[in-house]
């Protein structure tokens, strides 16, 4: 265990509070015209994707109605099975929530042999069949009817048709399996109404799919993503604007378990990164011909894991500029873009997945032995002291950490994840923010017009006056690369892991061009 005082981390947090106050007051300028166009484009794409999806639904389900917003319907569509007894299903697979310690968590799924799992699925979730729909003869397709009273008048209230259950259509099974025929991997894929179809599960299973199933899954994930963009981000950017077209997000240091900043009104921390997210175009400079300047740490959490673990291979890879995503792609047998989602999962305790993912996680553990050994040390530390302490003095409590009968530690994923995420985004990034704020006040005379307007995970965003462009680029670079000296001053440690940053600038937050920092 590292014997450190928590005071340095506390001082850092107090100083950061002042900086965050300035960021909130400065606000972020929103272009109403850009935002309106973004909404229109999203809604067109959303409608087009919905139509494409429903054509595939009709192809694989026949006339069976499917509501894409229903987890039960999606389960039947993807896995071609429909649960006949939900209560028994939940009981067999131990689905639901329970109190563990003081926290309400999902129950751990039942462990069972593959053969037993397959048998249970066959018994409780028969294969779904395609259907043909015909108009209900009882209600003539209306779904309800009125009784004729003795007086000869029709009853005022409508009665739901029992024959068609109110839908106006009678669905008759045809002898053909419906759906996309995805096979569940085991109890971990079960959900209350069937099987999981959430984003994480579909991303994991995408490599197992082909043909129509893969096309549908890819379109559905994009459809779901755009719906989230509209309902969460576009709506929020419209809702929280003041009369001058600014939004003023609230930043919080005490919400996430790791100490990473969170924000609300709106929540910027969940916004997708980079040029793949058109809603960023709505964020513009408040100055005529002004700029949005963003500084982003490259692979910060990977480098932090190397520093905390002392892994010699990570130091070597960073020094030589190794493309770690290409290594992932090579091991998994996928393209580099697809590999990106998996590269750093082992840093956070990722060990399970499909065959390709498991192969990569195993290879990562063998390549980065220092990280693997460090993970073991963290678990032993958590079990023996009930906490993990960072070089900054920041502590994470794990009061329920114990080895179970299989040699695993309760909360092992958090034990491995919190130190990396915490030191990177709750210690290093705040150092850079505070340094930048100090430089803005002390070096620019009279006071700088440019302001810090946002921070998202390991990036810092500024609104830059056109007359201060070169100065702000220089100051942001200096602030983000000061970590070695500042970590020594604040925490008394030698942070010897090389840090690299990317600076980009443009007239809105979407259309940014990279700056060659060697020219600064």
Name the predicted role of every residue range.
Residues 75-76, 145-146, 169-171, 258-263, ...:
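Flexible loop/turn segments at secondary-structure boundaries
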Residues 250-335:
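Function-dense linear segments that define catalytic or interfacial modules
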């Amino acid at each position: 265990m590292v014997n450190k005082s928590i005071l340095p981390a506390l001082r850092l947090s107090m100083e950061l509070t002042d900086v965050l106050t300035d960021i909130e007051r400065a606000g972020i300028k929103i272009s109403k015209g850009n935002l309106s166009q973004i909404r229109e484009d999203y809604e067109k794409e959303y409608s087009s994707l919905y139509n494409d999806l429903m054509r595939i639904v009709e192809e694989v389900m026949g006339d069976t109605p499917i509501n894409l917003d229903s987890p039960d319907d999606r389960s039947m569509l993807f896995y071609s099975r429909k649960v006949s007894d939900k209560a028994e299903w939940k009981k067999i697979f131990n689905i639901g929530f329970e109190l563990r310690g003081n926290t309400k968590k999902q129950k751990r799924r039942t462990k069972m042999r593959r053969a037993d799992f397959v048998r249970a699925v066959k018994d409780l979730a028969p294969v779904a069949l395609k259907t043909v729909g015909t108009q209900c003869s009882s209600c003539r397709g209306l779904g309800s009817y009125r009784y004729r009273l003795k007086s000869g008048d029709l009853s005022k209230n409508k009665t739901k048709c029992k024959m068609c259950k109110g839908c106006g259509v009678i669905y008759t099974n045809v002898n053909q399996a419906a759906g996309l025929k995805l096979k569940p991997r085991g109890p971990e894929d079960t959900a209350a109404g069937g099987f999981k179809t959430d984003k994480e599960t579909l991303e994991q299973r995408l490599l197992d799919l082909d043909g129509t199933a893969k096309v549908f899954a890819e379109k559905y994930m994009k459809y779901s993503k755009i719906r989230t963009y509209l309902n969460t981000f576009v709506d929020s950017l419209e809702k929280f604007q003041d009369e001058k077209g600014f939004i003023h997000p609230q930043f919080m240091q005490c919400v996430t378990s790791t100490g990473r900043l969170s924000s609300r009104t709106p929540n910027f921390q969940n916004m997708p990164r980079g040029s793949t997210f058109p809603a960023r175009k709505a964020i513009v400079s408040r100055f005529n011909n002004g700029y949005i300047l963003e500084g982003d740490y490259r692979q910060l959490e990977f480098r932090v894991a190397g520093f905390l673990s002392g892994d010699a291979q990570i130091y070597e890879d960073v020094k030589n500029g190794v493309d770690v995503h290409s290594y992932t792609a090579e091991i998994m047998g996928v393209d580099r873009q697809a590999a990106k989602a998996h590269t750093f999962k082992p840093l956070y305790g990722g060990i399970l997945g499909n065959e390709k993912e498991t192969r990569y996680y195993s290879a990562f553990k063998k390549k980065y032995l220092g990280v693997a050994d460090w993970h073991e040390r963290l678990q032993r530390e958590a079990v023996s002291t009930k906490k993990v302490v960072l070089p900054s003095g920041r502590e994470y409590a794990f009061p329920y950490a114990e080895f179970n009968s299989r040699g695993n530690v309760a909360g092992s994923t958090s034990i491995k994840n919190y130190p990396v995420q915490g030191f990177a985004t709750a210690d290093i990034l705040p150092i850079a923010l505070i340094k930048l704020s100090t430089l803005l006040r002390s070096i620019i005379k009279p006071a700088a017009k440019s302001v810090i307007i946002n921070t998202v995970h390991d990036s810092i965003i500024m609104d830059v006056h056109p007359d201060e462009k070169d100065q702000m680029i220089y100051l942001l670079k200096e602030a983000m690369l000061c970590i070695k000296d500042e970590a020594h001053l604040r925490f008394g440690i030698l942070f010897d892991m090389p840090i690299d940053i990317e600076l980009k600038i443009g007239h809105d937050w979407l259309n940014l061009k990279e700056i060659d920092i060697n020219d600064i």
